[in-house]
Amino acid sequence: MPKSPTPIPAPPVKIQRGAPSRAPAKKRRRKKKRNPFLWFLQGLVRRIYFGLKTGFKFLLLVPVLVFMVAFSYNVDRSGLFQGALAPRRIVDLMLQGYDVTNFEQMDERQVVQLYAQDVPETPEAIGIGSSRVLQFNRENTGVESFFNMGVTGADVRDNMTSYYKMVTYGKAPKVLLWSLDPWVFYGSEAAFDARADADLYNEFLTKVLNVPTDYEEPNQVELWKALADPAYFQGNVDYYFKNRGQATVTDDEGNTIEFNPVEGDPYNQPTTIKRSDGSVLYDVAFRSQTEDQIRTLAAEACMSFNSVHMEGFDEMSQTQIQAFDSFIKYAQSQGTTVILVLSPWHPYLYGYLLTEPEMHKGFFQVEN
C-alpha cells in the first residue's frame, strides 16, 4: 500500500474540566514548644512594667495627698482632731505667754485637755481641783513651769482625768498639787458635775484602774477618712485664708471667738481673766471687797452649802476611798510626787455648819 503523504492526526487528549489539580503535598512544620520558664519571665516582666507605670502615676499624686492630709489636720476647722476652735485659741494664747480675757465663757475642761495635748514641754508641777486650787500660780508655788489644771466645780472625774491626759501624752509632771474637795469621797451621783467628761473617766477606770465600765474604744476609721476628703480640705482652705492675719478670729460658723490677749496691767482688769499659767485672777471689784462684804457672801453660801456636790453626804464612801488610793499609787508609779492640799473654808461657814453637824457628817469626816 502506497504511503500517504498526509500524516495521520493523533487522537485528541481528553481534558477533564473542573477537577482540581493537586498541589504537591508539603511537609507540616512542627510547632516549637515554648519554654515555660521564659513564658513565665515574659509575663512577669510585663506585669512589673505596667505595675511600675501605674505606681509612678500614683506617686505623682502622693505629695498632693500628703499636703491635703497635713493641712486639714492642722487647720481642722471642725475640731475633729485638734479640738474645738475657741479652746484652741485660748491654749494658743496661753502657750505664747498671754493672759486671756472672758474667763466666764470658757470651756475650762476643753482648755485643760488641749493644754495637755499641745504644751511642748512637760511642766514640772501641775495643780488639780476646783475653784480654790485656781489661786495657785507660778509666783506662790515658786515653780517657774507650774501649770494650773483646776476647773470650776471640779469633781473626782475632772481631777483624775486631767492628770491622766498628761500621762497619755507622755508628760507626767514631777509634782501633782491636789486641792482636795470633800465631795471627792462622796459616792453619790450628787457629787458629780454635769460638765465633767464621763467617757474619759470611764476610759481611765477601764485602762488604768481595771475597773469594769461600759467604755468602748471609739471607731476612728470614719474620723480619719475626713482628712482625705476634698470637701473638708476645701473648707479648711477657705477658713485659713479668711482668718489669716485677722485680729478677730471666727469659728466654723463665722461667729467671733471672744477670747483675746489681756491688755494692760492684769491686776487692774474689770473682768476675771485666765492667766497664762492656768490660774485665775478675779476682777478688781471682787478682790477689793471689805471684810464685811466677804462675811456676807460666806453667810449667803451657808444656805446652799450642801447643794455643791454634797447633798446627802453622810459618810465617806469606801469605794471612793479605794479609788482615791488607787489614783495616788498610779501617779506615784508615773514618777509623780502627790501633794495634798486641804484649802480652808471661811471661818463663818465652819461656825454655821457646827450648829447642825448631823447634816454635814461626811464633810467633817473629810475635814478631820
What residues fall within each predicted segment?
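N-terminal secretory targeting modules
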Residues: 2-121
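Short alpha-helical segments and helix-capping/turn motifs at coil-helix boundaries
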Residues: 108-114, 159-166, 323-324
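Membrane-embedded segments
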Residues: 121-214
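Second-shell loop/turn segments in exported
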Residues: 148-153, 310-317, 327, 354-357
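Soluble non-cytosolic domains of exported or imported proteins
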Residues: 153-157, 171, 288, 314-322, ...
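Short, conserved beta-strand edge motifs with alternating hydrophobic and charged residues
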Residues: 339-343
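Substrate-gating cap/lid alpha-helix
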Residues: 348-368
